């Protein structure tokens, strides 16, 4: 996946990869161009990197109909306001409270609701509210192809980090299962290559999250009342310790879910299991 190179996925969809590779972004953020001519939706324009913005403008020949974002993390939406102004098109998406992880430059002209339709010449995107990774996250189903643009709801090659309070493990698992209610064949993730089997991927991710939740409970019982630093070593013993600071965020999301279900309790940042 080479930054700046347009990759044609179908008659309706092209992809550009932003030059922002890293542990959390994989090969870089995927920007998708849906449609052709004057009816091009720019989906997840990515970070405000000049070379990437120019590549997007060149790929759509300076013409677009809207800029659409899955969510407002800094690797997905900062280029939106720049492109919207330059191409004189509206921004579409949703905002959330500032939790120090959001792109505050994204102020949509059209604020989405679940099941809203975005339509162009020969294509229709159905907005699917998928809170979890963050509470303003949306996926977009290209109805003509059964292809869902998943942002950070589903990534190829890794699981996504859930960061409370904007992120919720309980909501994330429910939102994964929600995709199974739609006629989805494949996943176009925010990072990485196309995933051809949406149902199989969703089922795998749900199993993984529930397995990790089981390890959280086992860890609580093994080490007794403990803080996040003590727990992460046990719960994420299969993860590179260099990533444990990120892992603690998802683990906290698991703990909050367990607390809401009456299986864990916390006092002064010390967590413990509740019941048998």
Language-model regions, residue ranges each:
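Conserved beta-strand hairpin/beta-sheet module of binuclear metal-dependent hydrolase folds
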Residues: 3-58, 139-156
């Amino acid at each position: 996946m080479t930054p700046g190179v347009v990759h044609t996925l179908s008659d309706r969809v092209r992809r550009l990869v932003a030059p922002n590779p890293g542990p959390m972004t994989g090969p870089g953020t995927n920007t998708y161009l849906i449609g052709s001519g004057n009816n091009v939706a720019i989906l997840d324009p990515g970070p405000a990197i000049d070379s990437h913005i120019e590549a997007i403008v060149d790929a759509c020949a300076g013409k677009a109909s809207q800029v659409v974002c899955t969510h407002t993390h800094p690797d997905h939406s900062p280029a939106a306001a720049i492109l919207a102004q330059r191409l004189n098109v509206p921004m579409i998406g949703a905002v959330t409270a500032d939790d120090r992880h959001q792109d505050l430059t994204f102020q949509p002209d059209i604020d989405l609701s679940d099941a809203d339709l975005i339509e162009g010449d020969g294509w229709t995107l159905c907005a699917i509210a998928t809170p979890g990774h963050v509470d303003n996250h949306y996926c977009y189903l290209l109805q003509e192809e059964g292809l869902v643009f998943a942002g950070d709801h589903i990534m190829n090659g890794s699981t996504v980090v859930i960061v409370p309070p904007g992120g919720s493990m309980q909501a994330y698992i429910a939102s994964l299962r929600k995709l199974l209610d739609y006629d989805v064949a494949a996943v176009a993730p925010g990072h990485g290559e196309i995933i051809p089997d949406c149902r199989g991927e969703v089922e795998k991710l749900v199993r993984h999250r529930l397995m990790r939740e089981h390890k959280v409970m086992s860890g609580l019982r093994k080490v007794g009342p403990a803080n996040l630093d003590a727990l992460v070593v046990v719960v994420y013993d299969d993860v590179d310790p260099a990533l444990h600071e990120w892992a603690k965020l998802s683990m906290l999301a698991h703990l909050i879910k367990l607390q809401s279900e009456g299986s864990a309790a916390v006092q002064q940042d010390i967590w413990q299991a509740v019941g048998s």
